[in-house]
């Protein structure tokens, strides 16, 4: 099997895993509600919380983080197996993670209308390089707590993780790939938050704890 075919398979696996809309599934199964008809219409944990089900929001957050991490870990396992068989293997782990992030934002099952990718990128960060995951989580929680804006927390976390990757100890080639893919995910994440950014600038963004 050619390297190109392997990369396509890894990307497809990551995308399909990332495109599973756990927020929508959980809200429908246990909350009898279509989360797309609630609040912002987003399928992520923040909007699931607006249904009044903290338990479902927590599960959504867990699974959205998990699918990003799982995509990276599965790709890592495959790369390791390939190395054992052939003596060489490309590092395809972050390609799978970026694909999972893309799948969450643009899931094929929902007409390519998905979430904003914060939790999934957090999972990718933890699995790709745990330091980036810790930086992401701390920056997200602190900025959300200080500003009381969930959107600000997610955006600051993604930017902080991308900056941290610039100091990642790795070969030049792998380092450049990580910087490029983390930067790409962050740019897309910011684009997915463009509505939030407009509301922040106009003073109309909802704060954490505000009634919807």
From Swiss-Prot:
Catalytic activity: an acyl phosphate + sn-glycerol 3-phosphate = a 1-acyl-sn-glycero-3-phosphate + phosphate
Pfam name, any one: G3P_acyltransf
Keywords assigned by UniProt, alphabetized: Cell inner membrane, Cell membrane, Lipid biosynthesis, Lipid metabolism, Membrane, Phospholipid biosynthesis, Phospholipid metabolism, Transferase, Transmembrane, Transmembrane helix
Keyword Membrane attached: yes
Single GO MF annotation: acyl-phosphate glycerol-3-phosphate acyltransferase activity
Membrane topology classification: Multi-pass membrane protein
GO biological process, one term: phospholipid biosynthetic process
Cell compartment(s), UniProt: Cell inner membrane
Documented EC number(s): 2.3.1.275
Transmembrane segments: 6-26, 56-76, 92-112, 122-142, 150-170, 171-191
Any one cellular-component term (Gene Ontology): plasma membrane
Metabolic or biological pathway, per its Swiss-Prot or TrEMBL entry: Lipid metabolism; phospholipid metabolism
Quaternary structure (record): Probably interacts with PlsX.
Function: Catalyzes the transfer of an acyl group from acyl-phosphate (acyl-PO(4)) to glycerol-3-phosphate (G3P) to form lysophosphatidic acid (LPA). This enzyme utilizes acyl-phosphate as fatty acyl donor, but not acyl-CoA or acyl-ACP.
Family statement drawn from the similarity comment of this UniProt entry: Belongs to the PlsY family.
Name this polypeptide is given: Glycerol-3-phosphate acyltransferase
Organism from which the protein derives: Zymomonas mobilis subsp. mobilis (strain ATCC 31821 / ZM4 / CP4)
Primary gene name: plsY
């Amino acid at each position: 099997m050619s390297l190109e075919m392997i990369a396509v398979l890894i990307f497809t696996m990551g995308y399909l895993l990332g495109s599973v809309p756990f927020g929508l599934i959980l809200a429908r199964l246990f909350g009898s509600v279509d989360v797309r008809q609630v609040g912002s219409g987003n399928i992520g944990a923040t909007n699931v919380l607006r249904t009044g089900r903290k338990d479902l929001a927590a599960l959504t957050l867990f699974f959205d983080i998990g699918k990003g991490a799982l995509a990276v870990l599965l790709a890592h396992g495959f790369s390791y197996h390939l190395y054992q068989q052939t003596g060489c293997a490309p590092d395809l782990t972050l390609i799978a993670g970026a694909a999972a992030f893309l799948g969450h934002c643009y899931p094929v099952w929902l007409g390519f209308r998905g979430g904003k990718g914060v939790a999934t990128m957090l999972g990718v960060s933890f699995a790709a390089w745990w330091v980036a995951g810790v930086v992401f989580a701390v920056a997200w929680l602190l900025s959300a707590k200080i500003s009381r804006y969930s959107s600000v927390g997610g955006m600051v976390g993604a930017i902080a993780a991308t900056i941290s990757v610039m100091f990642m100890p790795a070969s030049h080639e792998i380092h450049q790939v990580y910087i490029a893919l983390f930067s790409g995910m962050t740019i897309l994440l910011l684009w997915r938050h463009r509505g939030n950014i407009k509301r922040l600038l106009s003073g109309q963004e909802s704060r954490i704890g505000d009634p919807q």
